């Protein structure tokens, strides 16, 4: 299997992220309460927590789909807004256009001679042979691979993942976790993964951040060699530590549903 052609070093480095005093309110409800984060370039971070804790709101702020009520979001020393072109977002729904073939979904919005690049991106996710098929012919896991290829073709420095594997069966989910990890190690982008699956968070991330009622309740380094042996004692111990903390946190009301942005406002791997 070939991989995407080597890019200049600038494109292979992740974006360092920082938030300072980050707050978000919806009406009278404060969903994020002064979040302070420092994420080195190229780190793989998983964000976990109960439903309604604020983790999805945090990801929306990082993606530029919503604006903070107070505080700062930085890419290095610059406002995060300046890194929007180098940021891509994947959702649980692959959001493929059903009237466009797979390769055209990957190259959506591109101009010039983009088809060779789209084929390279598809090959990097193992789907070059499905380039000229319709999305309806693909399984759920294959559709997410296409969405990932659509992100990779832009050589992102920041990849935001909002429960992208939540609808997949267990085996396909593990395969996608391994694929995302391999591509992250190859390209060096910064990854933030929002997930309800604690085992997934511990298996793939360098660091697991637990959001509790809008605040950072736990910031755990996963200091395990890669590739990680699933079922190992150390992995199970870390998973248990995070899960016990999640279960001890009180539940919260669901996060408010924001107004859906127009398709042209999204940088969801297109």
Swiss-Prot record:
Catalysed conversion reaction: ATP + H2O + aliphatic sulfonate-[sulfonate-binding protein]Side 1 = ADP + phosphate + aliphatic sulfonateSide 2 + [sulfonate-binding protein]Side 1
Keyword Zinc: no
EC number: 7.6.2.14
Single annotated GO MF: ATP hydrolysis activity
Binding site for ATP: 49-56
Compartment(s): Cell inner membrane
Domain ABC transporter, residue spans: 17-238
PROSITE patterns xrefs: ABC_TRANSPORTER_1 (PS00211), ABC_TRANSPORTER_2 (PS50893), SSUB (PS51291)
SUPFAM superfamilies: P-loop containing nucleoside triphosphate hydrolases
Top-rank lineage group of the source organism: Bacteria
Pfam families on file: ABC_tran
Gene Ontology annotations for the cellular component aspect, listed alphabetically: plasma membrane
Xref: InterPro entries: AAA+_ATPase (IPR003593), ABC_transporter-like_ATP-bd (IPR003439), ABC_transporter-like_CS (IPR017871), ABC_transporter_ATP-bind (IPR050166), P-loop_NTPase (IPR027417)
Listed PANTHER family: ALIPHATIC SULFONATES IMPORT ATP-BINDING PROTEIN SSUB (PTHR42788:SF17), TAURINE IMPORT ATP-BINDING PROTEIN-RELATED (PTHR42788)
Family: Belongs to the ABC transporter superfamily. Aliphatic sulfonates importer (TC 3.A.1.17.2) family.
Function noted in UniProt: Part of the ABC transporter complex SsuABC involved in aliphatic sulfonates import. Responsible for energy coupling to the transport system.
Record's protein name: Aliphatic sulfonates import ATP-binding protein SsuB
Species lineage: Bacteria, Pseudomonadati, Pseudomonadota, Gammaproteobacteria, Pseudomonadales
């Amino acid at each position: 299997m070939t991989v995407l052609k080597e890019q200049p070093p600038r494109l292979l480095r992740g974006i360092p992220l920082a938030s300072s005093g980050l707050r978000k309110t919806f009406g009278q409800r404060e969903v994020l309460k002064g979040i302070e984060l420092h994420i080195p370039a190229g780190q793989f971070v998983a964000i976990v927590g109960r439903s309604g804790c604020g983790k999805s709101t945090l990801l929306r702020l990082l993606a530029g789909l919503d604006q903070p009520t107070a505080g700062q979001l930085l890419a290095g020393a610059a406002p995060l807004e300046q890194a929007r072109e180098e940021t891509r977002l994947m959702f649980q729904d692959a959001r493929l256009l059903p009237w466009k073939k797979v390769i055209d979904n990957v190259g959506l919005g591109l101009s010039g001679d983009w088809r060779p690049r789209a084929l390279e991106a598809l090959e990097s996710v193992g789907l070059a042979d499905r380039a000229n098929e319709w999305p309806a012919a693909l399984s759920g896991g294959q559709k997410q691979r296409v969405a990932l290829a659509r992100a990779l073709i832009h050589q992102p420095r920041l990849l935001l993942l909002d429960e992208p594997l939540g609808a997949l069966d267990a085996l396909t989910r593990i395969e996608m976790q391994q694929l995302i990890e391999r591509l992250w190690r190859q390209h060096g982008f910064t990854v933030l993964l929002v997930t309800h699956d604690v085992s997934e968070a511990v298996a793939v991330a360098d660091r697991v951040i637990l959001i509790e009622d809008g605040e950072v309740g736990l910031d755990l380094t996963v200091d395990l060699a890669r590739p990680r042996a699933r079922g190992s004692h150390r992995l199970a111990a870390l998973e248990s530590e995070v899960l016990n903390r999640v279960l001890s946190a009180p539940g919260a009301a669901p996060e408010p549903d924001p107004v859906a942005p127009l398709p042209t406002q999204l940088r969801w791997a297109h």
